């Protein structure tokens, strides 16, 4: 029996209190928004104090994200010191999968290992790199990274997540086609901007890497001319999904496993898909763009599913949990679920909880509960 406070994610932040002493074990704060906004930070601190005031006894631990610079991490460390308890850092994608498990009673009290597919825009990995296209073996409070999407460069850092054309340029560079960056993007973003990004990629200047599925969606949307700069979060991914849906309403699509490869260390490489499908379509042919968007969705889903199935067999696991904001995408989710179920695996998804960052705190608390109980 324990009481765990979890401070939640950086984006779409919400905190929760997990109290296993009472039947209704989870109490949630309101959603505060993104912690880049000082008002959200103030709201989080107020909510946490309210949760602590409502608890029926002393807390046992405080969970937070692995990132050391988040306000939520600083708050957790301070509160842990004040209450004389442990502050427990939980990796972002581990927490996404744990949030799913926390909602499934079969995995409470006596958790069994699962394969987790965690897909989103960003989360700090244990290696210091930005993750987000992960296949994990999760065993309660512990996890092992058993696969991930091949990394893409973020030219300019975080700004690349707001400008899909930059991710498209990074994809061209990754495919050995950097010479196409300037002629392809100068007409839409200007020659100077296109040349600057080309130079940054060639020289690896301010070009961190990420395995995030969200950035692969951005790259695909940018390559197909569906999005240059985003006005709101996931705008490019939504446009890509809409294009795919238009095609799939009236067409069947055959996916080829030659459009991806898996390296011995579990890196899922979808560059063959870019070369065969996304780089060549005529932006001015809507039908070709829609077909390419559909092929991207189904191929990415099949590549991730195939590796998850292989890992489930290797580790003798029969459950696969899906977490992260990319699973708001219906085409991706339906395809992954159908592939996993066709292989005889049991698929776990969030039920009443958001699959995105708004539900992350429950996963943090669930992992911390396992660590605190050891």
Task: List where the protein language model places each region.
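Short glycine-aspartate micro-motif
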Residues: 3-6, 63, 114-118, 210, ...
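Glycine-rich phosphate-binding loop of actin/hexokinase-like ATP-binding domains
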Residues: 113-173, 194-247
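A contiguous, well-structured pocket-lining segment that forms one wall/lid of small-molecule binding clefts
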Residues: 11-42, 46, 176-200, 204-317, ...
């Amino acid at each position: 029996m324990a009481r765990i406070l979890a401070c939640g994610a950086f984006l779409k932040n919400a905190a929760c209190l997990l109290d296993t002493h009472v039947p209704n074990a989870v109490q949630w704060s309101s959603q505060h928004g993104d912690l880049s906004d000082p008002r959200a930070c103030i709201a989080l601190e107020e909510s946490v104090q309210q949760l602590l005031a409502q608890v029926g006894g002393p807390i046992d631990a405080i969970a937070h994200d692995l990132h050391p610079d988040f306000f939520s991490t600083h708050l957790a460390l301070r509160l842990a010191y004040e209450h004389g308890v442990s502050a427990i850092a939980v990796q972002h994608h581990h927490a996404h999968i744990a949030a799913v498990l926390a909602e499934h009673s079969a995995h409470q009290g006596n958790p069994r290992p699962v394969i987790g597919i965690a897909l989103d825009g960003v989360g700090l990995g244990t290696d210091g790199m930005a993750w987000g296209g992960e296949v994990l073996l999760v065993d309660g409070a512990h996890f092992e990274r058993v696969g991930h999407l091949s990394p893409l460069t973020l030219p300019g850092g975080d700004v690349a997540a707001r400008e899909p054309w930059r991710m498209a340029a990074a994809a061209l560079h990754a495919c050995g086609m950097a010479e196409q960056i300037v002629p392809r993007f100068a007409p839409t973003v200007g020659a100077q901007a296109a040349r600057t990004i080309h130079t940054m990629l060639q020289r690896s200047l301010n070009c961190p890497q990420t395995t995030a599925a969200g950035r692969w969606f951005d790259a695909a949307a940018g390559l197909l001319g569906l999005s240059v700069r985003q006005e709101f979060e996931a705008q490019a991914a939504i446009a890509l999904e809409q294009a795919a849906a238009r095609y799939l309403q009236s067409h069947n699509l055959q996916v080829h496993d030659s459009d991806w490869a898996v390296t011995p260390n579990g890196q899922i490489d979808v560059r063959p898909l870019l070369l065969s499908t996304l780089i060549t379509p005529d932006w001015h042919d809507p039908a070709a763009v829609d077909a390419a968007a559909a092929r991207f969705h189904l191929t990415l889903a099949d590549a991730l599913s195939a590796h998850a199935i292989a890992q489930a067999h290797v580790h003798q696991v029969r459950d696969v949990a899906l977490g992260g904001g990319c699973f708001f995408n219906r085409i991706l989710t339906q395809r992954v679920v159908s592939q996993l179920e066709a292989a005889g695996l049991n698929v776990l998804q969030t039920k009443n909880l958001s699959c995105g960052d708004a539900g992350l705190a429950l996963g943090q608390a669930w992992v911390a509960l396992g660590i605190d109980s050891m």
